[in-house]
């Protein structure tokens, strides 16, 4: 786990509306949902498909104000072979990806869980979002691998400083498969719950 970077954000501007529900709920096997939290959370992986969306789903059910993002140039999903991924633009909706893969090979993408994942995703928000295009303020940014952490920190450091609002960036290494994404999402949720009952993020030590 990598942590402790203190970056800065621009004021809120030109941000897409939150697609996920902020309604409190109970995830499978989870404890009772906590009240809505003022902590503004972002979860970031490479393609905004598996790890960040699983965490987005669980955190939103627990009442957190959460958004999820990818940092890649394009969205990549597994294809029929390791060297033949399905590549999409970030403007492509989850529903469009779902229908494209359904047409290409329903059996393959049902068996490997990609269609199920996309079906979940489109219930949370319309399309993947790229972190570098978002100018919203966050108290806590959680990344799902070290490379993504580095990309987030690099982007934050490249932005013009307009406020003194600190943001805490923590990396939680999560393997990019469905099982590890679920386990990682509960770990991220536990971490957010700990931070939300600690002193305000703006006053935490770097």
Give residue ranges: language-model regions:
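Short polar/charged helix/loop
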Residues: 2-206
């Amino acid at each position: 786990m990598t942590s402790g970077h203190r970056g800065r954000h621009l004021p809120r501007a030109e941000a897409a509306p939150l697609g996920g529900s902020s309604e409190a709920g109970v995830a499978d096997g989870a404890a009772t949902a906590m009240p809505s939290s003022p902590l503004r959370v972002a979860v970031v992986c490479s393609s905004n498909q598996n790890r960040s969306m699983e965490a987005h789903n669980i955190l939103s059910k627990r009442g957190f104000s959460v958004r999820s993002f990818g940092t890649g140039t394009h969205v990549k999903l597994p294809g029929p072979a390791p060297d033949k991924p399905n590549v999409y633009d970030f403007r492509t909706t989850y529903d469009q990806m779902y229908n494209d893969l359904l047409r290409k090979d329903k059996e393959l993408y049902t068996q490997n869980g990609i269609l199920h994942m996309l079906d979940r995703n489109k219930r949370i928000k319309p399309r993947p979002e790229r972190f570098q295009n978002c100018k919203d303020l966050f108290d806590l940014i959680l990344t799902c691998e070290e490379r993504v952490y580095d990309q987030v920190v690099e982007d934050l450091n490249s932005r013009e400083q307009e406020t003194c609002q600190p943001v805490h960036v923590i990396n939680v290494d999560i393997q990019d498969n469905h099982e590890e994404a679920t386990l990682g999402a509960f770990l991220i949720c536990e971490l957010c719950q700990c931070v939300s009952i600690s002193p305000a993020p703006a006053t935490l030590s770097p």
